[in-house]
Amino acid sequence: MSDISQQMNNLSVQDNNKPNGNGYSGQPQQQSGRRQYVPPHLRNRSSHQPSSNGANGDIPFGGSRRSDYGGGRGGFGFGGGSNGGGSGPSGGYRNGGARGGSRGGFGGGRYQRPTPGVGRWVDGKHEPAPRNDRLELELFGVAEDTLFQSSGINFDNYDDIPVEASGEGVPEPINSFTAPPLDELLVENIKLSRFTKPTPVQKYSVPIVAAGRDLMACAQTGSGKTGGFLFPVLSESYMNGPAPIPESTGAFSSHKVYPTILVMAPTRELVSQIYDESKKFAYRSWVRPCVVYGGADIGNQIRQLDRGCDLLVATPGRLKDLLERGRVSLANIKYLVLDEADRMLDMGFEPQIRHIVQECDMPDVQDRQTLMFSATFPRDIQMLARDFLKDYIFLSVGRVGSTSENITQKVLYVEDEEKKSVILDLLNANSEGLTIVFTETKRMADNLADFLYDQGFPATAIHGDRSQYEREKALAAFKSGQAPILVATAVAARGLDIPNVSHVINYDLPSDIDDYVHRIGRTGRAGNVGIATAFFNRNNKNIVKGMLDLLTEANQEVPDFLNKIARESAFGRPGRGSSRGGGAGGFGGSRGGANRDFRRAGGASGSSSSGWGNSSSSGWGGSGNSGWGNSNGYSNGGGSYGGSRSSFNDNSSYGNPSSQNSWW
């Protein structure tokens, strides 16, 4: 980190012509003379061959030229690759077992050849499939391949993160991945993934789910939340098997799937990532993962579902569509997972989620286990839990809503007209590794990516107006290092876990401090170190108080201009900090109490760790069942958050979440 700090200290916003070790400079270059960035996992190979699917050194990145950039991922494609967003059949998760007694062939008693890597549930016992070297290479890579890395050099630091679990009868945490309590097959897959020890959220989630309890987990971004729900629900599924098909539907129906596990998340990138992880941990088991999301051909997704689906990862809009078409039944759901739950509500998905959970054929809250995971859980989201969870355990890991000390944060005062000059200096000074640049609008993302390309920097862009094919190509090119600079809107700000991201630049700062936290969380993940640089000016003074709190909490340097603007804002516009919970210090001193269990003391903060105050099992300090929608921090937001957060839909890449044509 000393070298990085030295580079930052030597940074000049005036010198645009400074060359670096990779030959980049502020002046335009011929692309043919540019040295291509080679990611760490490819550096020891004899040659770095680009993708054969259209991504090579001759294909440019900028503007319409960038639309041809990158290549589709073969094998286990990102979100299905060329299969249009389905759970691509090349992965070996085609048919597996069936919905009959022995799960030996799907639909109508047809005989189908066993699929490599897919086990069976026969006569009440789990029969794992034989190991398959080809699938293991595709799923887990090789030991030195950091594209599949699972831990960083500071991973042991997580042992010092404080954990607070509230609720009655909290089980003791685990300290290692062992069988028991985990299923033996899952432990083998975890070892293949090179996970050496559980993160704090995983230490608690495994015994909590094994005890049959519901869970609300609030943990730092990059702290292993995906494994926190996949590990326990898959382990329990391997040991207990699938539920029988409801008799009223016919045991051999080939037109509807009956998943055991449902995972809902807000964006297609996040569900695709969860699906990729689920394939690793479901390897050789009877559980067949599938993924569905908007923006891809629904016909292809239906065909993938018809081949069998036991774990369904979905965005709310596409799942609602498939339910209405009669292609998915939720009657057999044992485990419901809501990932990034706060963001799903922020984006207006509450009506769709309530319809799926409460109005379809999903088992009642008493007959399923529900897990809610996110980086933040403000009070309005916790209040929603009264309808979705029962007797749950609230888990708060670390300083929830704050940032990791593994991330070195730098805040630079940059006027809007100087931003392009400064970003060239930044990229010249820190040319190694992958860089994500965040903008507030789709137009700016394209404009900046074109500008960087014209200046000799291999950049690509993703946002909501890009087709799914273009987005998959851009992400694949970025992860492979062929385009080591990714310009993105908020579509990539949450949940995506891309290894080797060493630098995050907030070219445009968001209006919500929580969004800033999630953006910079794309680096410094799983114990690795990273740099986050923010371009700040007086147009961003609405979040200055929140930024001061974050920098102080993470022991980061606070520039003098930030303190000065904060004092000015305090006189001119008192009380404007974070847009949630009334700014910093609202409840429990963590921006609205995002890491507090509001069941304590009838919904008030600051209570002791023992007892539940005056709140009942279903009450929230006297709040009625319908009161939460208008009592949250989004005035006029109601259920869709449209009144006070209209700028979110205007400037983000999510589009209109209520539209049937949206990409969810």
UniProtKB/Swiss-Prot annotation:
Residue stretches of biased makeup (Polar residues): 1-18, 648-664
- Which GO terms label this protein's molecular function in UniProt? ATP binding; ATP hydrolysis activity; eukaryotic initiation factor 4G binding; G-quadruplex DNA binding; G-quadruplex RNA binding; mRNA binding; RNA helicase activity; RNA strand annealing activity
SMART domains named among the record's database cross-references: DEXDc, HELICc
Catalyzed chemical reaction(s) = ATP + H2O = ADP + phosphate + H(+)
Any Gene Ontology CC annotation: spliceosomal complex
The chain positions of domain Helicase C-terminal read 406-566
Q: Where is this motif: Q motif?
A: 175-203
Q: Write out the entry's keywords from A to Z.
A: ATP-binding, Cytoplasm, Helicase, Hydrolase, Initiation factor, Nucleotide-binding, Protein biosynthesis, RNA-binding
Q: Where is this region: Disordered?
A: 1-129, 569-664
Top EC group: hydrolase
CDD domains tied to this protein: SF2_C_DEAD (cd18787)
Q: What is its EC number?
A: 3.6.4.13
Q: Where is the signal peptide?
A: none
**PANTHER family in alphabetical order:** ATP-DEPENDENT RNA HELICASE DBP3
Q: What does this protein do?
A: ATP-binding RNA helicase involved in translation initiation. Remodels RNA in response to ADP and ATP concentrations by facilitating disruption, but also formation of RNA duplexes.
**Note on domains (UniProt):** The Q motif is unique to and characteristic of the DEAD box family of RNA helicases and controls ATP binding and hydrolysis.
Supply the name of the protein. ATP-dependent RNA helicase DED1
Organism of provenance: Lodderomyces elongisporus (strain ATCC 11503 / CBS 2605 / JCM 1781 / NBRC 1676 / NRRL YB-4239)
Question: Which gene specifies this protein's sequence?
Answer: DED1
